Amino acid sequence: MANLFDAPQFIEDAPSLAVNAESHTTATQPAVIFDDVGKVFANTRGVATAALANVTLNVARGEVFGIIGRSGAGKSTLLRLVNGLEKPSSGAVRVNGVSVGELDERGLVTLRRRIGMVFQHFNLLSAKTVRENIALPLKIAGVPKAAIEKKVDALLELVGLSAKRDAYPASLSGGQKQRVGIARALVTDPDILLCDEATSALDPETTQAILALLRDINQRLNLTVVLITHEMQVIREVCDTVAVIERGEVVETGPVWRVFGDPQHDATRALLRTLVHDLPTDLAERVKPLHDIAQADAQILLDVRFTGADAREPDLGGLASALSVEGGRVSFVHGGIDRIQGHAQGRLVVSAQVRANADSTVQAQIATLLERARRYANHVEVLGYV
């Protein structure tokens, strides 16, 4: 697979193009800064609606930064501020050290040549071949034909479509169309790649392949990627950092492993629900509240969570031994442990037997279970008993 660093940077041959972003900023400064950004839209009757409010974020150079939220949360508006398709009503958006809102039309053209865009619905020209679709931005910029051909060939190899260079979009699968879109976005050697729900129109298998391609491109080219999505699985697979947006405000942000392992906001927990190991219906129907417990022998269900904050791996064997109070049975009935960015995290539902005797009540044994479980996990609570 080709490395674009091996190909000449043909964008320099195009007329009226700006100096590289490195002249405006340093490699240690964020690629994108949202500084207390607000965006207000007014309808035809002059009624104002706040799409974004008080958004402050830093996107580090070379990272994959994910923005997630439900439909209408403000994700697309936030993304459009980066390339100047929208201007902030308040605050500032800085890209490579330049305030986007202060640029004139010529400055915006220059900015957009350093920012690639990948769309949800591909936006390919049906009457042009794969090669022609990818080459279009360079052709418009006046780059020599020989240079265009060489660059397009390198990109086709990078995205795995060399055999499709003369095919038309109608003959391509959804995943192949998106690969063309990615190649086209990279043809001007951008510093930043914006992805607007780039996988939401794809099947799960194709989605995985496109996400792997985006991560490969990010690592090969040290390219800053900003993507928006409503799918937590996309964030989990490809992002380094995530920001959760709800009703126009960023309610939570941080490394993906930390946000997934210990979500702090209800909106984040709601979005994560598709990935969380909830109790199966048959088990949930059998669980009784703890205050109803009367028998001297019961199976207590504990919700045991690992956030990934600890350097050590979860010691499940030690946990099982610790919960065997008075020799009672212990079993893991549901859940699992996953790894995100090198951090082991997850949720387990553990069944532990308690039996009252002359020396200890059921309530005392439950208290012992909780105390012991908390030595091994970050969060533990009693779900009830069966």
Curated annotation (Swiss-Prot):
Residues annotated as domain ABC transporter: 32-272
Broadest EC class assigned to this enzyme: translocase
Annotated family: Belongs to the ABC transporter superfamily. Methionine importer (TC 3.A.1.24) family.
GO molecular function: ABC-type D-methionine transporter activity; ATP binding; ATP hydrolysis activity
Species: Paraburkholderia xenovorans (strain LB400)
Chemical reaction(s) catalysed: L-methionine(out) + ATP + H2O = L-methionine(in) + ADP + phosphate + H(+); D-methionine(out) + ATP + H2O = D-methionine(in) + ADP + phosphate + H(+)
GO cellular component: plasma membrane
Lineage: Bacteria, Pseudomonadati, Pseudomonadota, Betaproteobacteria, Burkholderiales
InterPro entries in UniProt: AAA+_ATPase, ABC_transporter-like_ATP-bd, ABC_transporter-like_CS, ACT-like_dom_sf, MetN_ABC, MetN_ABC_transporter-like, NIL_domain, P-loop_NTPase
Membrane topology per record: Peripheral membrane protein
Full protein name: Methionine import ATP-binding protein MetN 2
Cell compartment(s), UniProt: Cell inner membrane
Binding-site residues for ATP, renumbered to this chain: 69-76
General function of this protein: Part of the ABC transporter complex MetNIQ involved in methionine import. Responsible for energy coupling to the transport system.
Record's subunit section: The complex is composed of two ATP-binding proteins (MetN), two transmembrane proteins (MetI) and a solute-binding protein (MetQ).
